[in-house]
Amino acid sequence: SSAASDVYKRQALSDNPDGKEWYKHRARQFTTTQLQPKEIHDLGLNEVARIKAEMDDVITKSGFEGSFDEFTNFLRTDPQFYAKTEEELLSGYRDIAKKADPELPKLFGKLPRMPYGIIEIPSYAAKSQTTAYYRGGSQKDGRAGYFYANTYALNTRPKWEMEALTLHEAMPGHHLQISLAKELPETHPLIQNLSYTGFVEGWGLYAESLGTEMGFYKDPYSKFGQLTYEMWRAVRLVVDTGMHYFGWSRDEAINYFCLLYTSDAADEHS
C-alpha cells in the first residue's frame, strides 16, 4: 500500500515530531559526549579521508598494480584469502588469540581472571548473524567469556580481517574490558554490567589499534583489514548523521557506504 511504502521511505529520526532534538539526545547518550550531529558528521568525514589515504599507501606498498576498486575486488574474490573449511577458520582465530595472549602483560598492568574461548555461532543462528560477537562470562556460574565466530558462508569471511576481529572481540578487546568491569571489587552490579556503546565499541576499536605493537598486521592484507574496520566506524558516523539529521535517503547512505567499505552487501545493508 502507499501508506506502507511511505513508512518504508521515512526512516530518519528527523522525520518524526521533534526528531532532530531526539537525535541530538540519542547522540549524547550513545557517545557519552556533548558533540552535536554536525560535529560528529565532520569528524566522520575527516576520519574517512585520513583512513582512505592510509589505505592507498598500503596498496602502493603492497606492490599491487591497479586501482583501489581493483584491489578491494582482489581481496574479496581471490581464493587465497578464504578458509576452505569451518575448522580452518576457527583454528585461524584461535591461533591469533594464542599469539596475542603473551603480548598482553607488556601493555596492561591488570588482566582479567576470567578465561575466554572462541567457538562458532550455532548453525541455526549463523545465517542471520553478523560476522562475530562477544558474550561475557560469569565467575558466579563458572562460565567463560566467548568470542562467537560466524563460519557460515566461508566466502564472506576473509582472512585479512581476522587479526583485527580477534583483537576486537577477545583480548585485548571486549573480553578484557567487560571482564575487568565485572571483576571490580566492592562495586554495585549495575556499574559492573552497565554498557555504553560508545565506550564498549570504542574500546574494541582501540584494541584493534594495538595490533601493531603486539606484532600483528605485518602483511599488507591484514593491515588493510585493520584499516577497513576503522573505515567501517568512520563511515557510520557520516551515514548515521546523514540519514537521521541531514535528510539523506536510504540509497544515498548505502551508496556512500559502498564507495568506501569492502564488506559484503549483507553487512552494508545492516
PLM-predicted stretches and their roles:
Residues 1, 5-263, 270:
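N-terminal maturation segment of proteins
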